[in-house]
Amino acid sequence: MRYSHTIERFCGIGKRNGIGYNQADEEKASHLEIHAGEWIEMGYRLFSDMTADVSDELMAGMPTVEFVPMQVELGEENYTYGPEGDLTVEHFYAEQRGGKFASTSQINPMVYRECFEKALKAGEDVLYLCFSSGMSGTLQSANLCAQELREDYPERKVMVVDTLCASVGEAMLVREAARMQHEGLSIDELAAWVEENRLKICHWFTVDTFEHLKHGGRVSAAAAAVGTMLQIKPMLHVDEEGKLRVAEKPRGRKQAIRTQVAHMKAGWTPEMGKLVVVGHGDCPEDGEQLKQAVLKEFPDADVRMANIGPVIGAHTGPGMLALIYWGNNR
């Protein structure tokens, strides 16, 4: 089953340049298609994982990134989430709305080996941008696999970088990394750039219900009951350790959106990048409302939309809204 957007690369399966391009990038897209081998000639492949909630709109015109699949338990069923997996965003949220809870697990080192080894056997190095270590033990699995592969392929580089980001924030960092790779940065230069700039990705999330936060142990049952009664929409952010924290407790959806925009007004640094990402967990109308609120305050912002996938959605549930932008600090 194909993943809900059309990005094709999945551990070496699919088209090298199979993503969609917008009109403005037509000339660049033609160049990429004609010179498809240029991706290989750069000497290394860029990987991330399915926590990075990319979309065609967000990645339009960018060189393709390969995504390592992740496992999601939904109710009593286990799924593989990825472009060639058996779980779509639509099915995931439909099941959640039907009363099922979800959980995720860190990526098995053997899954990493299967993905990375294809590049190494082709004579390419590997740079993997990993889901935040503050939210998962996935980084440990990646480092374990990387060490084994370095021993098996001593002539090749296998580099793992902790993004300290999640969801559409991770996606925005990966997008910029893909662009800079295509512009000619070496694997060492790009790894250093990611480490230097990862904390400049600012994440502000709001959730519509306490139900999934309570189930995941992020809030107590008593706090969830009071918050639900008062119509509180928890405001979460990713801190400098890459951990998801409850920051504020606005009441009602409109106030939550105003709070997100207020944080952006206080911290957005447009000279670092005008790209802003709005993510939504199966609530496109609310996502559009947040997008328009951002554009009203910041008409020059390049606002793009993306779905929040099952990896983060497992812990936040339907109705999550994310606002991601470049800033000097979190």
Spell out what each predicted region is:
Residues 4-7, 21:
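Short terminal hydrophobic/aromatic SLiMs and anchors at protein ends
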Residues 78-142, 147-151:
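Class I S-adenosyl-L-methionine
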Residues 15, 21, 25-41:
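Short, Lys/Arg-enriched N-terminal segments with co-localized hydrophobic residues
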Residues 39-41, 45-72, 76, 127, ...:
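Mixed-charge interfacial surface used for oligomerization/domain docking
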Residues 8, 17, 30-32, 90, ...:
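Short non-domain terminal segments
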